[in-house]
Amino acid sequence: MFRHDTPAEADFRMDVRTWLEANLPVALRGRTARPPPVELMPWYHKLSRKGWVAPHWPRQHGGMGATLNEQIIMTEELARIGAPQLPAQGLNHIGPILMAFGTDAQKAQHLPPIIAGTVIWAQGYSEPGAGSDLASLSTRATLEGNHFVVRGQKIWTTWAHHSDWMFALVRTDPQAQPRQAGITFLLLDLHSPGIRIRPIKTIAGDDEFSEVFFDDVIVPAENLVGKLHDGWRIANALLGHERLATSNPQFALMALERIKTMARASGIMADPTFQERLAAASIDVTALSALFSHAVELNNQGQSLGPESSMIKIFGSELLQALNDLLIEAAGGHALTDRPIATDFGEVDVAASFLQSRRVTIYGGSSEIQRNVLARRVLNLPG
């Protein structure tokens, strides 16, 4: 959005655009709600066969090994056609973590199925008493010989009832101080005995999230990632990837297109005041794209994102909410309906888009927590 393609990049963009037009099912285009894995995986498999499912992964692990600019081009073209987000927990979260911290055996076991789309991953972080204050987690894992015994509960776990594996933070030393020092990073087979999964109906009407209960679940010791009690350090590395993924400008670009579609249909596009607000929103989306590209470049160079991950999480999530507020304004009275609105310019599900945007400032670290991080780490304020 803020740069010009080289001739080679322009050719690559046209290749991506042409292939997406020919291969992305119409039923998946422009979907406001994230399709469940059962609907999404055929598209995932098609991208995998093309070699495009993981542009940011190195070739040695089955990825595309794309340059930064190629990754940006793919993000823009996926947004342009309204492609749905792929399951992020495998591609953007545990995959990069295993590349950095996993054993050779863990990489060999788990990375190829992520690329192939034969295994779906869930993230086991939040608990009923530990959300933004994640260090308060209480799910216990006791090492007994060559295995751990896990007891406890996770909540707000995305697509757990469709997943095969979970990466989770568990408490292995309840006496450790600070609390972060007693946390370990484990891989759990969700088909193991003692695991119960209960979907949660959300305000948007979907059941994307679940509660997960662990009743004396046996986890082999070789499923430990990194060292015992060192999970917090790994989790911090993962949070950088997660905040990058949740602030991907693809979502903002798609929201901007929904606003334009709705504004043309309602007639408000001719209003100068609305045009001014839309222009300001477009500038913010361009700024997010620039910030995202900078963060991706640091990440690709193996550098820690540090405070940048908090900055992009705040800006990206709050911008998405602001865009959906503008979508409500563009829809006018039509925003009161609880079903997609058919227009001459395409279908827009205004209510679902608005409701789903409410949670983005909470998951992955709330805006309040991120501002505290910036206050401490950038401004050197106490707390």
Give the positions of each predicted feature.
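Amphipathic, small/basic residue-rich leader segments at the start of a protein or domain
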Residues: M1-A88, Q109-A116, A245, A265, ...
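Glycine-rich beta->alpha junctions and the first turn(s) of the following alpha-helix
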Residues: F2-D5, I195-L291, S353, V360, ...
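Glycine-rich phosphate/cofactor-binding loops in nucleotide/flavin-utilizing enzymes
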Residues: F2-D5, N69, I73-M74, H93, ...
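C-terminal helix-coil-helix/basic helical segment that borders enzyme active sites and/or dimer interfaces
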Residues: L28-P35, I268-Q275, T286-A342
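Internal helix-loop-helix
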Residues: R49-A108, P112-T118, W159-W165, V285, ...
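A short, Trp-centered hydrophobic/proline-enriched beta-strand micro-motif
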Residues: G117-Y125, L169
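A structural signal for short hydrophobic beta-strand segments in well-ordered beta-sheet cores
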Residues: T139-T142
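A short core secondary-structure module
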Residues: N146-H147, R151-R198
